[in-house]
Amino acid sequence: MDSAFLKLDAAEFLEIWQRFDADDNGYIEGKELDEFFCHLLKKLGTNAITADKVQGVKDRFMSAYDITADGRLQIQELANMILPEDENFLLLFRRETPLDNSVEFMRIWRKFDEDSSGFISAVELRNFLQDLFLQHKKHITGDKLDEYTDTMMKLFNRNKDGRLDLNDLAKILALQENFLLQFKMDASSQEERKSDFETIFAHYDVSKTGALEGPEVDGFVKDMMELVKPSISGVDLDKFRQILLNHCDVNKDGKIQKSELALCLGLKANP
């Protein structure tokens, strides 16, 4: 779609998003989606808008832009649909491959939570965006950077406290489903549990050192805790991380060896 005809900037995009994501759940879906496409037809100057016309344009655009094929529009999908490319700051977060590992997510989190407060402040978010623009070799004025920072805060800061938490950043980066959800440890035999453990450890041991350290521990803790508490804060994560290290890090080297984690879980790991 040639979205330039709408001549939108980031602030106007925010206004459209907030208007049609009426229930503030992070998606435009159902009746909201129909109302959005009706609005789009009016913007295009379409006369005599009918339900069939709305359905037709909806089918056409959803097949092109609903990347996740879930019948609803996420923020990034809507931005791709209606923002001109030079205004689509969300393109900065587009990745060659989906972010499907919490280890990489936590590496990003630790980098930009500069003061280790458990939150990303507006200043830290501004630095985050500036860093992304530099990575993409794009020049941006200070005023434009401020505008994008403000828009990002309003789009993703769900509780309106002026700072982003883990869940806000997960939405921005489109973090994939929790890796641990596929495992049902309680219903498994001992052999199945050992096999699952090997798969799980290999997933989080991104560096392949035989030990979890730094963001590898963070990623494991995040996914493990979110099995029982779907939305944890950065502060909660740091607490749970320290509890896990106190319990499992027998040799106190700040890492969790494969054998140490197996012992904590009542298993014997393969060498």
UniProtKB/Swiss-Prot annotation:
Residues binding Ca(2+) 5, per UniProt: 249, 251, 253, 255, 260
* Biological process (GO), any one: regulation of presynaptic cytosolic calcium ion concentration
Any idea which positions bind Ca(2+) 4?
Answer: 205, 207, 209, 216
- Which UniProt keyword terms apply here? Calcium, Cytoplasm, Metal-binding, Repeat
Residues that bind Ca(2+) 3: 159, 161, 163, 168
Q: Give every EF-hand domain span.
A: 8-43, 53-88, 100-135, 144-179, 192-227, 235-271
What are its GO cellular component terms? cytosol; dendrite; nucleus; synapse; terminal bouton
Provide an example Pfam family for this protein: EF-hand_5
**What residues does Ca(2+) 1 bind to?**
21, 23, 25, 27, 32
The subcellular localization recorded is: Cytoplasm
Q: Please tell me where Ca(2+) 2 binds in this chain.
A: 113, 115, 117, 124
Q: Which GO terms describe its molecular function?
A: calcium ion binding
Q: Which PANTHER family match?
A: CALBINDIN, SECRETAGOGIN
This one is known as: Secretagogin
Species the sequence originates in:
Xenopus laevis
